[in-house]
Design a protein with these regions (language model features):
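Domain-level signal for soluble alpha/beta catalytic cores
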Residues: 1-312
Length: 312
């Protein structure tokens, strides 16, 4: 759906949905120790569809498929390698069914999620094959775009995913986690393991986090049409958006998290309220963010509040 990119070029605002995995957990869907929320595609797919429907009712312009942790290297490690095709096809089908079921007065796009979840111990050749496989399945299943959600590096792994995603011919948006170091430089990665040691997960870095500017310079020329900050501390979003604007002149966006990770579950503690989330989102909009949504801990109430504040 290249119309999304055209809408961004026209300066329009787009509302992304909120969290998938943590919202499934919130309503009682068990998380897998290895494959996290992908397990829901096997055990309780109807609840995945209902979650998508709720985001549509809340006002989302874009639905994200439950495929964040559904690449082959993740599912094989969880003993579900034979379900790669089925889970990815099913995830797209459920999002499409939700779109068909809920009549809304706007065009709704479906974004196929790809990530580095569980991939840090996978060699480059396997990652290339696995990302190619997942990108092709998502494209064949009918997603309108691919959303690369990378909560850390190494950059070479993101490059591999980018090239495979772009090769489908679909629009690709790149989302990166960022934290701000003591020198006020934005770095690629997740602040949690840098400070308190919390938020540890299969996405965490195994080496020093590179500057975000380096990541942008290497990755955005590969063909992404938008750049977003994902799964980052809310107070790091503004300086991250500023760093993005210094190194990229295209559309930018933000969907940070609220809460804390103690795998395989999200801890809904120290949560920002939907009302306060809207207030900080207004600052992101002033910084030029055209795309806003939510990551872990940010559910349908937040999306509903964002829609009321930014009717589009």
């Amino acid at each position: 759906m290249f119309v999304l990119d055209q809408r961004l070029r026209n300066g329009e605002f787009l509302l992304l949905d909120g969290a998938i995995g943590t919202e499934l957990q919130r309503i009682g869907v068990p998380m897998d120790d290895v494959a996290w929320c992908a397990r829901a595609m096997r055990d309780q797919p109807d609840l995945v569809r209902v979650l998508h429907e709720n985001y549509l009712k809340a006002g989302a312009d874009i639905l994200t498929t439950n495929t964040f942790s559904a690449a082959r290297h993740v599912l094989e490690a969880a003993g579900m390698g034979g379900l790669v095709d089925d889970m990815n096809f099913k995830a797209v089908r459920l999002a499409r069914q939700a779109r068909d079921n809920i009549d809304v007065p706007r065009n709704v796009a479906i974004a196929g999620s790809m990530s580095r979840f569980g991939g840090r111990q996978t060699d480059s050749a396997a990652l290339e094959a696995n990302y190619r496989e997942q990108a092709d399945i998502l494209a064949e299943s009918g997603v309108d775009m691919l959303l690369l959600e990378f909560l850390g590096g190494p950059i070479i792994n993101i490059e591999i995913a980018m090239k495979e995603a772009v090769s489908t011919g679909l629009p690709v948006w790149l989302s990166l986690s960022s934290w701000i170091d003591e020198g006020q430089e934005a770095r690629l990665g997740n602040r949690g393991h840098q400070s308190t040691g919390r938020n540890q997960g299969p996405w965490d870095m195994v080496s020093e986090d590179p500057l975000l500017s380096e990541a942008i310079d290497r990755l955005m020329p590969l063909g992404a049409s938008a750049l977003l900050v994902i799964h980052s501390e809310i107070y790091d979003v503004i300086p991250t958006l500023e760093a993005m604007k210094r190194n990229w002149d295209g559309p930018i966006g933000a969907y940070p998290h609220s809460g804390d990770w103690v795998g395989p579950n999200w801890q809904f503690v120290n949560m920002i309220s939907p009302e306060d989330y809207v207030e900080v989102a207004k600052d992101w909009r002033q910084q030029g963010a055209q795309i806003v949504g939510g990551c872990c801990g940010i559910g349908e109430d937040y999306i509903k509040s964002l829609r009321a504040a930014f009717p589009g």
